[in-house]
Amino acid sequence: MDSDFVPPSVSFQLPVIDFSDQNLKPGSSKWDEVTADVLKALEDYGCFEASFDKLSVELNRSVFEAMEDLFELPIPTKQRNVSSKPFHGYLCHNLYESLGINDANVLEKVNDFTQQLWPDHGNKSISETIHLFSEQLVELDLMVRRMIMESFGIENYIDEHLNSTYYLTRLMKYTSPPDDDDDDDEETKLGLRSHTDKNIITILHQYQVDGLEVKTKDDKWIKVKPSQDSVLVMVGDSLCALLNGRLHSPYHRVIMTGKKTRYSTGLFSIPKTGVIIDSPEELVDKEHPRIFKPFEYTDFLHFFQTEAGRIAQSALHAFAAF
């Protein structure tokens, strides 16, 4: 686990990559250009800012309003959002609160979620909003993962890889820190401790209030301030393992400053139950010996829940490294 100590951070512009071009199709010169940019950004930072015009102002506003309505529900109601899988249902810890929806790119699954919270009638408007939003992010996720596989010469595994995952859409709320009666200055607190994501790819979108920070390879914390029509695309530990360590999953955290509540969304591509994460032979050679043992994602999550997993500098290496 990375330290929860909050060192100073600096403002920094991560690479911004445009995915809005209508000519962005596999095999096109534009595709090759963007693929090269994606690889460079992920090798350098483990993440990048993606400009994606399908996240319209109207859609972003609708998602924001839906989250306000959802988090205003009583806690016992939100606790109906349950899952047998770790870190998938309703979560609440200190300043952080979150709801999770499996396969939110499928409308029926979102309807099941709203039916949990409104048993009598569900919530058609919220269901349609979350479904449309998730659909758009899934489209971006699929493009990015295809580009990554092509970059490392393992395009023969693309269909197998894309079919081996499902999606979790997470809606997140970070409450502003409590007032300090003895200090008029803005108070800064850790909204979400430093961590790496355990899945394949994460796509994060924050609304109006910033707070996300990413740790660079040289151990500097940088403030991430994407525009309202862009998202942060980030490598997870499972992708790092699949690629035999060719890309890294960056530490990131949320710092709460001031008195405004922060809302954000996350789309997580996750290996399905029973799928074994193992580097293809094409990525293993004398210069790149195999780093990780094959493993199942759920076993990795269960390890992360143990004391050994929580205190490890890298849960992935502690769990799966040779």
UniProtKB/Swiss-Prot annotation:
Keyword flag Membrane: no
Enzyme class: oxidoreductase
GO molecular function: dioxygenase activity; metal ion binding
PANTHER family found in the cross-reference section: 2-OXOGLUTARATE (2OG) AND FE(II)-DEPENDENT OXYGENASE SUPERFAMILY PROTEIN-RELATED
Function text: Probable 2-oxoglutarate-dependent dioxygenase that may be involved in glucosinolates biosynthesis. May play a role in the production of aliphatic glucosinolates.
Family listed: Belongs to the iron/ascorbate-dependent oxidoreductase family.
Stated name of the protein: Probable 2-oxoglutarate-dependent dioxygenase AOP1
